[in-house]
Amino acid sequence: RDDVESRGLGDVYKRQFMYDAPSKSKHVNQAELDYIEQDNREAGSAPMTDEKDEKRMKFWQCFSYKQTWAFVFGKFMTDGVWWFFLFWTPSYLNTQFGIKTSDPLGMALIFTLYAVTMLSIYGGKLPTIFINRTGMNPYAARMKAMLIFAFFPLVVLLAQPLGTVSPWFPVILIGIGGAAHQSWSANIFSTVGDMFPRTAIASITGIGGMAGGVGSMILQKVAGNLFVYASGTTMIDGKEVEMTKELLEQGAQFVHPAMTFMGFEGKPAGYFVIFCVCAVAYLLGWVIMKALVPKYKPIVLE
């Protein structure tokens, strides 16, 4: 406890007496300052002002701007896809292929999934390339990049069909979808700084983060219920329960038949449906964002 308290007091001391804004710090040279503030000097960006001189946006006032709702819907529509890939992929491998993540093959597949996802580290560079080459404003550059990234998750539509050939195909395709999400995510967060004054960025980011969390919760809940429904049900000791492979092998009869979709039956059919949702979520999110904020319009508090 004493150690925690001493560290806390140390942090307070550093903040109060040692920290200074980069523009005022004697330890930051001009080259470093230019690098820190480069985003604020991009074409079309609002002029720099001292944060103390900026007017504050009240929390409820945030909801009166279309720019807020564009960010909210962009997060709501897409965050759940990322968490679905992370949370359900191990279960998918076990259900579809009988591969456990504790098996050597399962470990190799999960490692490959995350390795492919790391391609997203290049996603944040694309808007800068557009700005430098065409001189477009930051918001337009990021939206153009996000549209490109929104097409990549469409490959997830092929996860189930190609999964009949090898488990490596869906894992790689899901990894590409995950990489596209991270590239999308890096840019959608940056649109907040493009459109809102610095004093409002934390509030808008928090609102969007909550919307993403709600969207994630809904998608995971719907997916779980869909997988149970897709499996069909049987009667055990007078109770209706989910049909499993083991019960089916023991001769259990369906009370409600397994779901079929595009040639797949049972849980694989359910996964196919959710993969379709994940594949188009980014394009739908982009269309909503573009409809709400068709052109770059920074908010200026008066």
Protein language model features and the residues they cover:
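Single conserved hydrophobic/aromatic residue that forms the stacking wall/gate
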Residues: D2-Y13
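Multi-pass alpha-helical transporter architecture, strongest
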Residues: K14-M18, V156-L162, K267, Y271-E302
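Juxtamembrane intracellular "pre-TM" segments in multi-pass secondary transporters
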Residues: A21-V72
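Extracytoplasmic gate region of multi-pass secondary transporters
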Residues: F63-K125, H181-S185, F189, S216-G224
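Interfacial helix-cap and linker-helix signal at transmembrane-aqueous boundaries
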Residues: L93-N94, L126-P127, I131, V222-G232, ...
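Loop-to-transmembrane helix entry
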Residues: G98-V116, A141-R142, W168-I172, S203-G206, ...
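A late C-terminal transmembrane helix in Major Facilitator Superfamily
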Residues: S120-I121, G193-G232
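C-terminal transmembrane helical hairpin of 12-TM major facilitator-type secondary transporters
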Residues: Y139-N187
